[in-house]
């Protein structure tokens, strides 16, 4: 069985072949720590915007550099990647170690770049790269009340 979780170099090579065949490549990224229904709906919506959905996942060190919380991520990077790869709407998963996915987006050159509705379009990392080659940037509304931070707060409040 071929894995969907690939090193960057291998993924970029595969995507070059797909692009040559006219495949529309969609890219999104995130930490995806403690997956919830908001994540799955977001990823399903992203997939509907093209043929292949590539998900960039922050490594553990990258998540810690974002200063979400000192104890994040809860779930290790290899497990977060495997959970994402198990979803039917996700075609490929790739880890990235930088605080933002700018270099990865430049290498992948997606046709569609997708982020959650909590991102202002002009602040989306990689927007300039995608639009410069004729691609589009889209945002997807968040599921109200659903976030990993809210989920963690709820868990912590019930264990006190």
Q: Can you name each region flagged by the protein language model?
A:
Residues 1-160:
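Nucleotidyltransferase catalytic core that binds NTPs
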């Amino acid at each position: 069985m071929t894995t969907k979780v690939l090193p960057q170099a291998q993924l970029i090579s595969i995507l070059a072949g797909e692009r040559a065949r006219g495949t529309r490549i969609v890219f999104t990224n995130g930490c995806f720590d403690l997956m919830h229904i908001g994540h799955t709906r977001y990823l399903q919506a992203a997939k509907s915007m093209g043929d292949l959905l590539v998900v960039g996942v922050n490594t553990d060190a990258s998540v810690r550099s974002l200063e979400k919380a000192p104890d994040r991520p809860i779930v290790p990077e290899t497990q977060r990647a495997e959970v994402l790869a198990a979803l039917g709407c996700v075609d490929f998963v790739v880890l990235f170690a930088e605080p933002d996915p700018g270099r990865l987006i430049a290498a992948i050159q997606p046709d569609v770049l997708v982020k959650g509705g909590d991102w202002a379009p002009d602040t989306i990392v990689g927007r300039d790269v995608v639009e410069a080659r004729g691609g589009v940037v889209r945002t997807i509304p968040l599921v109200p009340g659903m976030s990993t931070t809210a989920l963690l707060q709820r868990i912590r409040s019930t264990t006190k």
